[in-house]
Amino acid sequence: MDNVSIWAIVDAAAEPDIFTMLDTLDPPHACLYAEPVTDEILGVAPFLILATPDVLAWLKVRRPPWGILLESQASMTTLRQHLRKYLHVLLPGEKTPVYFRFYDPRNIWPLISVLSPWELHSFLGPINAI
């Protein structure tokens, strides 16, 4: 596949050193939450980060559950737009959506295991692999 990039979704709530890494390495990145984001929310937000060799080396020494890696040919804008659709879910019997931390490795694998082939195709969208 041409132009496949590796991306990380890193959870600031699980990996507070993310901000130091972003300042130091300055990889292309975006918060998955819509702007404007308060500092309080930013501290627990998921970030989509291009997994450059330096970022991958940094992630290798982090303790789980910092997030997940994925492969995609899509642009950051397209990928962010797609992933944002899964940040909120409606639980049975509830009227208000709740945050869903799909990017937590403790959540993503159980989720994927129960999706039908069509649901998995829809969930992955522009993602080639997780």
Model-derived features with residue positions:
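Terminal low-complexity "docking" segments
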Residues: 1-101, 105-130
